[in-house]
Amino acid sequence: MNPNQKLFALSGVAIALSVLNLLIGISNVGLNVSLHLKGEGVKQENNLTCTTITQNNTTVVENTYVNNTTIINKGTNLKAPNYLLLNKSLCSVEGWVVIAKDNAIRFGESEQIIVTREPYVSCDPSGCKMYALHQGTTIRNKHSNGTIHDRTTFRGLISTPLGTPPTVSNSDFICVGWSSTSCHDGVGRMTICIQGNNDNATATVYYNRRLTTTIKTWAKNILRTQESECVCYNGTCAVVMTDGPASSQAYTKIMYFHKGLIIKEEPLRGSARHIEECSCYGHDQKVSCVCRDNWQGANRPIIEIDMSTLEHTSRCVCTGVLTDTSRPGDKPNGDCSNPITGSPGAPGVKGFGFLNGDNTWLGRTISPRSRSGFEMLKIPNAETDPNSRIIERQEIVDNSNWSGYSGSFIDCWDEANECYNPCFYVELIRGRPEEAKYVWWTSNSLIALCGSPVSVGSGSFPDGAQIQYFS
């Protein structure tokens, strides 16, 4: 075969291959169009299904490989989030188990751990996080000197993964302030921070990270809020705020927000005399708050909020088992309407309880005089029966170790339970004032626990840092 004949033969083969490739491409286009139209014709009542078609050099259709074809990926859109409805009761609890412990002070001996106080835990549909008010410094930083002070211009709210000590790299800044609360309504998160001078403070309100409104002091004496999570029902979030003296009559409001905007506010009603730092939880379309009386009572005041009517009432926990600190000895009879006084009495500490009839649990420091140790007490009908007594006790932190604030939280999005499992945290304060011999700073670690439906073992879970290592 001469060169010209070879050339014509090769050209003919090339043309034939090109035509074949073109025919395959046309068939692929037809297949893609038919699949696309078929996908559009499917109607679903709840979730929308979309088909994404990507054309590459090889097509895979039902595991059959064809030249130059398409990969078909299907994805399903999730349902839109819904508002939390608080339609469950509290679970029955037989004991408490630790779900997180961040050991922040132990890590802080060598790591750059942020100085915090007033920590709490709050959950949303994706999980739970720790929130805390930082002091604008780390433990080993010289600026940690003087962080015993509660209200400075350097403070702000941060969040970190629950169980992880707060560092600059893992902390998420939320807002500026020295008092805070935060809660999720099922669709978005509302946060309140309070900033400014003691006699002229301002509360800033955020919804999904955007500033929505501000609230100016109404009594010009340290406007303050819960220092733990608020609670939402059907898009409305209830928050307890106080302004006025810490050791005499103050002015408390229950405020209701929708997407960060005030829709109603009520002055405190009922027999409670003094309200600060409420620990609130939701159940049965209600919000129950166990608070701090910094003025007179060692029995804790409580607020009950009906979220369907947006109205509340207040009184005291009825039992004679006292749970504030400082406190006198337990009484044989309690009082549902009046503060129980005695020496030592004031000033108090943030605390909590779960008021659930026969399955009522109250938390308190073990020491009646100082913030040391922590225990959980099962006291059936403590919220209604002045003669109720302790039937079960579980030690959380032994009395030779420091504790601090404590508060309640609930993961309302835990679909594994047909009820709301009560949870709480304990702040483990280290440094000044109790350990001023060794350090100039004040900070904390945190431990979080949740209820168990069966009885549990025993154990103490203190902060555990050797404070002399910081000298």
UniProtKB/Swiss-Prot annotation:
Q: How does the protein's chain sit in the membrane according to the entry?
A: Single-pass type II membrane protein
How is this protein activated or inhibited? Inhibited by the neuraminidase inhibitors zanamivir (Relenza) and oseltamivir (Tamiflu). These drugs interfere with the release of progeny virus from infected cells and are effective against all influenza strains. Resistance to neuraminidase inhibitors is quite rare.
Q: Which residues form a coiled coil?
A: none
Its annotated compartments are:
Virion membrane; Host apical cell membrane
Posttranslational mods: N-glycosylated.
The residues responsible for catalysis, as annotated, are D150, Y405
* Stated family: Belongs to the glycosyl hydrolase 34 family.
What's in the domain note?
Intact N-terminus is essential for virion morphogenesis. Possesses two apical sorting signals, one in the ectodomain, which is likely to be a glycan, and the other in the transmembrane domain. The transmembrane domain also plays a role in lipid raft association.
Q: What is this protein called?
A: Neuraminidase
